[in-house]
């Protein structure tokens, strides 16, 4: 696969966020690191690691506008870690998973990340969620040399330039590559569509738009953007309707899928919708529609029938998939109750990859060794993801592709096979690799 890295198109954290991090660091500097828990520097940094435990941190919106769905991701990771711990841990070490609420607010993300690094002294961060939120802390984590693994966001910032962020790794398919795959499908299957874009006003939306324009630039007739936190998207949807967009592509979080659908209903606007995997879970969006409409919308999941989307993981409704079967068993034995959802599946999948990296690193675990493992071996890691990881010394981007899917009767149906690509001018090709199957016990083997 040809790969072109991108330079000069970065979405940098504003100086104000850097100042907040500095203030937080100074405030907590007195906590220091416990020298007794670390080996000499020459042996590598073992902060957060003892003979019996590995301390791992994460930030998620457990409250606030982005909490629906996203707040359950760490429950999936916790269930998987509990299962691994119950089976002896990783080289005898149990994983101590510490999750803090940032309410999808970058200022709060800065504060709680400082706590995790300087007070809790975590070994690594895993799955910290959000593009605007993680942009506020990525420089701090890298300057502190804390492994920042599997960021829960498809921003290219997490992996397109390892020299700038050597300690950070993406996980899911990046938004630019997703935009390319969506754009190519539209160009091939709906070449006469008048395309409107509904975008989150940050790197999430901007990267998606860049990928789309590689294939359907001339088809795009309108672009509407929203700022996270607001609840009225009437002007944005009305603008798309005014331009007679008959296909709307949304790079947005689930709450705004529901809000855009409610506004479209009020305006009697009925385009074909194509939401990214981020905002297309029918069960969650259906519940949000009922909530936001104060019960006026019933069976909201049915409103998404016919909606196009993408997928880089199997859907929980696919009960014949061996990964779904394995994770469902683990969820039933170690989860926090209720049926397994796609969000808990996401967290379990990240936790599986992290355990895979720990196993591949070996018993002598250091921060430096973990990063080296991901760069040298991560490209060969397998798991529930459909496409290979792109991990190497030159790229810290996550999985390399996805399927185009369609929602029918609350189920996710494949429209294409696995399409793989990369950022920049890399071509889109159909993957020839077969999907992997999980180990019998659901735990990656030690090397």
Enumerate the language-model features and the residues they cover.
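Extracytoplasmic "Venus flytrap"
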Residues: 40-78, 100-107, 129-130, 198-206, ...
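Immediate post-signal peptide segment of exported/extracytoplasmic ligand-binding proteins
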Residues: 38-58, 89-94, 187-193, 364
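Beta-alpha junction/loop-to-helix N-cap segments that form part of ligand/metal-binding clefts
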Residues: 40-44, 68-75, 87-161, 171, ...
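Segments of small-molecule ligand-sensing domains
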Residues: 333-344, 355-414
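Short, low-complexity disordered leader/linker segments with a strong preference
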Residues: 1-55, 430-447
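Extracellular/periplasmic Venus flytrap/periplasmic-binding protein
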Residues: 107-111, 155-157, 164-268, 318
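Periplasmic-binding protein-like
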Residues: 116-129, 147-151, 195-199, 244-254, ...
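Extracellular/periplasmic periplasmic-binding protein-like sensory domains
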Residues: 264-348, 440-441
């Amino acid at each position: 696969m040809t790969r072109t890295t991108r330079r000069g198109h970065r979405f940098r954290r504003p100086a104000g966020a850097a100042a907040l991090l500095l203030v937080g660091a100074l405030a907590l500097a007195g906590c220091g690191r416990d020298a007794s828990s670390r080996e000499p520097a020459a042996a590598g940094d073992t902060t957060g690691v003892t003979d019996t435990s590995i301390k791992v941190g994460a930030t998620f919106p457990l409250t606030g506008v982005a909490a629906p769905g996203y707040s359950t991701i760490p429950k999936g990771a916790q269930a998987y870690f509990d299962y691994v711990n119950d089976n002896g841990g990783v080289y005898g070490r149990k994983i101590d998973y510490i999750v803090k609420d940032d309410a999808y607010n970058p200022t709060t993300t800065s504060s709680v990340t400082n706590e995790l690094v300087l007070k809790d002294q975590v070994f690594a961060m895993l799955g910290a969620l959000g593009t605007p939120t993680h942009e506020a802390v990525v420089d701090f984590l890298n300057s502190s040399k804390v492994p920042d693994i599997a960021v829960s966001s498809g921003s290219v910032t997490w992996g397109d330039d390892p020299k700038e962020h050597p300690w950070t790794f993406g996980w899911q398919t990046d938004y630019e590559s997703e935009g390319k795959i969506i754009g190519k499908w539209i160009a091939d299957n709906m070449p006469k569509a008048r395309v409107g874009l509904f975008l989150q006003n940050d790197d999430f939306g901007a990267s998606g738009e860049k990928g789309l324009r590689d294939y359907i630039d001339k088809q795009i007739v309108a672009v509407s953007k929203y700022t996270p936190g607001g609840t009225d998207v009437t002007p944005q949807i009305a603008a798309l309707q005014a331009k007679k967009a008959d296909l709307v592509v949304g790079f947005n979080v689930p709450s705004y899928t529901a809000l855009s659908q409610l506004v479209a209903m009020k305006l009697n606007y009925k385009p074909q919708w194509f939401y990214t995997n981020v905002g297309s879970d029918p069960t969650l969006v259906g519940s949000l529609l009922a909530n936001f409409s104060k019960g006026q919308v019933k069976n909201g999941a049915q409103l998404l029938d016919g909606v196009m989307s993408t997928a880089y993981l199997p859907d929980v409704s696919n009960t014949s998939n061996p990964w779904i079967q394995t994770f469902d068993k683990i969820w039933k034995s170690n989860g926090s109750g209720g049926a397994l959802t796609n969000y808990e599946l996401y967290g379990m999948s990240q936790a599986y990859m992290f355990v895979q990296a720990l196993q591949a690193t070996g018993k002598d675990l250091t921060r430096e060794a973990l990063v080296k493992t991901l760069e040298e071996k991560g490209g060969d890691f397998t798991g529930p993801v459909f496409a290979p990881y792109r991990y190497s010394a030159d790229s810290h981007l996550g999985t390399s592709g996805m399927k185009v899917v369609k929602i029918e009767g609350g189920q996710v149906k494949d429209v294409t096979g696995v399409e793989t690509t990369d950022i920049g001018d890399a071509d889109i090709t159909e993957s020839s690799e077969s999907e992997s199957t999980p180990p019998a016990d659901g735990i990656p083997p030690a090397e």
